[in-house]
Design a protein with these regions (language model features):
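Short, glycine-/small- and polar/acidic-enriched structural segments
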Residues: 1-64, 72-75, 79-90, 94-101, ...
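Short Gly/Pro-enriched turn/cap motifs at secondary-structure boundaries
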Residues: 2-3, 110-111, 189-190
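Amphipathic, soluble alpha/beta structural segments
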Residues: 4-6, 150, 170-174, 222-233
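Short coil/loop linkers at secondary-structure junctions
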Residues: 21, 49, 54, 166-168, ...
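Short, mixed-charge aromatic SLiMs
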Residues: 35, 67-71, 166-169, 219-228
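Pocket-lining segment of extracytoplasmic ligand-binding domains
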Residues: 68, 74-163
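Secondary-structure end/capping motifs
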Residues: 127-209
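Conserved C-terminal helix/tail region of periplasmic/extracytoplasmic solute-binding proteins
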Residues: 198-233
Length: 233
């Protein structure tokens, strides 16, 4: 596990909804997300469900990448946005964040527990046939996760390839600081996180056949635990 939360923020457009008072104001509005079925869609649907807003009460629009999402919000194509990395729009006062799964608290408030997103995964057959490869990959990730727990802005500037900053180092660092606490310290699946994921999927997608899923077989901490012991993460 690399991130313990979805790292998605849901924001209201200050251009089209400057007088926003509550989630009920989203009825009849257009909501942007990266892709249907993705984690940002899951965050958006969970937020709407908690507010008692039905899908037919809003218009969901797939926007793809972050640049497309920013353009859609700025031009008034969408009134709200469930997406990754709104740091630039936050700094400019273009959005008002009302749900934030970049933080542990925000994720627990929305889903009732931690909901890991980024992770290392593979078919069971591959894991069984290539355990050494799986262990090596896991070791690299856990080592990096440990480093990220103490890395300062200067460390990031020296390590991250320049093109990742897209010409704005300060914005990159601000974005990283917003998600920092969600980064796993050791790569282990948090307790009850798999149950939170299953419960959320069953609630949001009642048509999915997940009743017989064996959660204990859906993940393993075996490789991460070895790497944690090795690097004292």
């Amino acid at each position: 596990v690399q991130t313990r939360t979805p790292q998605v923020a849901f924001g209201i457009s200050m251009r089209t909804l400057p007088g926003f008072k509550g989630l009920a104001d989203l009825r009849g509005r257009r909501i942007g997300l990266a892709q249907a079925g993705s984690v940002d869609a899951m965050v958006t649907l969970q937020l709407l469900a908690q507010a008692g807003i039905r899908l037919e009460d809003v218009s969901l629009m797939e926007l793809g990448t972050s640049p497309s999402a920013v353009t859609a919000l700025r031009s008034g194509v969408v009134d709200a946005l469930g997406h990754f990395d709104p740091a630039m729009m936050e700094q400019r006062g273009e959005v008002r964040i009302i749900a934030d799964t970049r933080t542990l608290k925000g994720t627990i408030d929305l889903f009732g527990g931690l909901l890991p997103s980024a992770c290392l995964y593979a078919p069971i057959d591959f894991v069984q046939k290539h355990p050494a490869t799986c262990q090596a990959l896991t070791a690299g990730i856990v080592h990096a996760l440990k480093w990220l727990q103490t890395a300062g802005p200067g460390d990031l500037i020296k390590t991250v390839p320049e093109h990742f900053f897209q010409g704005d180092r300060a914005l990159y660092l601000a974005s990283f600081m917003k998600v920092r606490e969600s980064i796993s310290p050791d790569g282990l699946m948090p307790a009850d996180a798999a149950q939170t994921a299953l419960r959320s999927l069953l609630g949001l997608y009642p048509g999915m056949r997940l009743e017989g899923v064996a959660l204990g077989r859906s993940f393993t901490n075996e490789f991460a635990r070895r790497a944690k012991d090795r690097f004292k993460a």
